[in-house]
Amino acid sequence: NSLITDKMTVDQLARDCYLPGNKILQELIEAQQGKFKIVFSISGTAIELLQSHRPDVLLSFQRLAETGCVEFMSETYFNSLSWLHSRSEFKRQVVLHQNKVGEVFNQRPAVFRNSELIYCNELAHFIAGMGFRGILCEGLDTILKGRTSNHTYAAPGNGDFGVLLRNTRLSDDLAFRFDDTS
């Protein structure tokens, strides 16, 4: 049964990741007196799962949001690749996600991230037209060509619309080697 599987997965993530991680982040924000900033991207379906199965986890994210040191990015509601297939469906999902973030976290996202961090200049222009101030995309070495991902770039023809590149090396260290003590 998929409901049982969803609950088991969410329970495991809550126990092993979300609750201990959010506790550490809350402590860091308090210890740094608001100088420590965080950005999350949580799909609409993930928010729904938390609402259904682990409202305590959702509450921990809401408490983080209340610090004023946490922002939520927007994305497609279902973490879909709708940009590649239908602009109207893409826009519908982005608006749906913005509304969910507003309802749950009392924020209006200013930065967008596409599924799998897929980027093209046309997407940046489209997203800027929806009122976003920036987009997060993959910071691959083939794109950077020796430049740093720790800099905000501009999308061609979009003035002050920011393009943020994921620091792949640091992100991979955190995701795959965080607990490596060797």
Language model segments and positions:
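Catalytic alpha-helical scaffold of carbohydrate-active enzymes acting on polysaccharides/glycoconjugates
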Residues: 1-110, 117-172, 178-182
